Amino acid sequence: MIAESMKALVKGSSVIRAMFEEGNRLAKIYGAENVYDFSLGNPNVPAPDEVNEAIKNIVDEEESVVLHGYMSNSGFEDVREAIAQSLNKRFDTHFNYTNIVMTVGAAGGLNTILKTIINPGEEVLTFAPFFGEYRNYVSNFGGKLVAVSPDTATFQPKFDEFEKLINKNTKAVIVNNPNNPTGVVYSEDTIKKLAKIMEDKQKELGIEIFLIADEPYRELAYDGVEVPYLTKYYANTVVGYSFSKSLSLPGERIGYLVIPDEVADSE
């Protein structure tokens, strides 16, 4: 018999994935050009030519044993350092390779950090509407996802409700900015309010509350809209990122976590 937890997971399996599979089925019948797929975030923009050239060069120039061999659990040091320096240049941060952990996409990163911090029965807060897989990610490790109800006029956080939901059992808050599915971007003022509430609650309750910034859509901000980098506003912040959207590479599953030195137990 399979585990009861897995039965429940399969029973509530991803609607997004089900829609994707149904889209594939319909495309075979009516032609892909006649089916509009709004399920998975599969970009319809090709990956940059530079990505394809880099892949070809690596395959041609790297020794096969090295290319296909095991690596450090955290990823290649030079790749992690390059990411750290890119972040420092863009966001005026002070990271180095030790703050970067390569992951299998943003989903792999979120599962990694949640497994690291959650004890069974602890709660993770997020703001509705949210990416549906969050509930599965949290439940994978015995946690409970608690959603702040949406302000359907603006889709901005309802801070009064958020503050009331934080308790001794709260382990983390997931913020998806820009948000999936609404596309809303939380401004610097909004992030500052969020950080202040979390800091005050940490002191009041005598616990560590982690802020998990889920950022696969960071580059999809237009018309001069700026997306705040959350590590600059709250010390206990971990960032999860993926190149799936920014470089149109969802199938490659390339992501990373940023774990600043200031995060509790960062080592």
Predicted stretch roles:
Residues I2-G105, T112:
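N-terminal small-domain helix-loop-helix segment of the aminotransferase-like
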Residues A235-E267:
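Conserved core segment of the aminotransferase class I/II
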Residues G41-P43, P178, S242-F243:
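Short strand-loop junctions, especially beta-strand C-caps/beta-turns
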Residues M6-K11, S149, T182, S244-K245:
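Glycine-rich "substrate-gating" loop/helix at the edge of Rossmann-like oxidoreductase active sites
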Residues D60, S64-G206, R218-Y233, V238:
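Conserved core of the PLP fold type I
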Residues E215:
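Walker B catalytic acidic pair
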Residues N44-P48, P181-V184, E219-L220, S248-P250:
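Short catalytic/ligand-binding loop motif for oxyanion handling, primarily in non-cytosolic enzymes
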Residues N177, L211-I212:
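Residue-level marker for buried hydrophobic side chains located in beta-strands
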